[in-house]
Amino acid sequence: LSIAALALGAKHAIGLDVEQQAVTSSLNNISEAGFENQATILWGSIPHPQLNQKKFEVIGANISANVLIELAGPLLSCLQDDGVIVSSGVLETRLCDVTEAFRAAGGEVQSTRQIEDWTASTIIRVNGLV
């Protein structure tokens, strides 16, 4: 996701993963793609101590429905007021659960696309909430 963001014009990307092997692979891939000076890859999840309550314009989250549900509040808390979360990798059978978790945390699903059983959604913060 960091490479895609940088290739699409982001000035800097920060990636998080809970698996150390994924962090190592991401660092190698970013180096091979020539973006090593534009990306930071960290081991862990949000909230993360190295992020110091940083707010993001765009958050990409290609993680399971269970993790999205658990992190709905923290993800929205990391989002700028006019920012957007792009979630992907959610099975259609779990989409309502994810949508409800974000709604309960102060978010709103703006759009959803589906290919076969998989969905991707854009989510914003509802002003005054979170």
Model segments located where?
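Active-site capping/gating segments
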Residues: 90-130
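A short SAM/SAH-binding and catalytic strip from SAM-dependent methyltransferases
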Residues: 57-70, 89
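Residue-level signal for inorganic ion chemistry
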Residues: 26, 64, 102
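A short glycine-rich, Lys/Arg-flanked "PGG" loop and its adjoining helix->strand segment in the class I
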Residues: 69-84
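Conserved SAM/SAH cofactor-binding pocket of Class I
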Residues: 1-45, 55
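Short alpha-helix immediately C-terminal to the canonical SAM-binding loop
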Residues: 23-24, 68, 95
